């Protein structure tokens, strides 16, 4: 996966399949695993840095669970650090935990984390100011490119150094680099606490970008996509400061369906997010290489995919939430074949 991340940084455009993060169950299932490796996805994102932008794929026949959502809500997720780059441990006896930073100059800073009188769990997380600044600039630029308001939220009232640094950097970069352009476009940058942001999102109409720290973005992108219809109906692209675009399906490996497939059982797996990951990468490649035919192919495939669903031919997950009354539930292979037929018309 480290090699994959480095290759991606050289190729500019890449498409990533879902990956497996080993846990105890996976270690038993795949004996070839030598250790409980960290998230492959997190490893790639740490190498590439940047921001993950996720937006729902909307169709007329599937309405959001939140009735007042009329436009897409794009989640901008910081792709580096926090819990995904953390270290943790479990201790069994009374004692104390400290955190020490040792500078190259030899200067040390030590903080007491906590004293405990019994078993405890500990976690140390970090982020880099350089990465936070890249995250902020990516979000502001994406807001300008798409002409949408930008929201950002943390818990700076509790995390007065960690989260407050995120808040301060966003505000500094906005005022010094982007404020005038935002005013020209009539769009707004808005900061609030993460709990207030969640409440506001539920009452909003959509049509904005919601910038989140790494963990918040992981959780909220799933919530937003599910409320709009399905996690399989969401685009996802990692944009790095070096100009790398990594397209992916927003969901994971669809484990339950995979096990059914191994048993020879029929599945009805929604492949829309995977299709849009490929079309997104192909379109961006076409834009960079000035290949309008490639861009047109991507557009045509996306339209054929959505037209197939609107015609009533879809996978089981969409059949459960569509407003259409005349629906044909297709299995995984037949859904892809139906899209091909639509495209060939």
What are these regions (language model features)?
Residues 1-8, 13:
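Single conserved hydrophobic/aromatic residue that forms the stacking wall/gate
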Residues 99-192:
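Glycine-rich phosphate/diphosphate-binding loop of Rossmann-like nucleotide-binding domains
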Residues 146-154, 178-191, 286-298, 308-320:
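Flexible, glycine/charged-enriched surface loops at secondary-structure junctions
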Residues 201-300, 304-311:
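Glycine-rich phosphate/nucleotide-binding loop
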Residues 316, 320-345:
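Phosphate-binding loop/pocket of nucleotide- and phosphate-handling active sites
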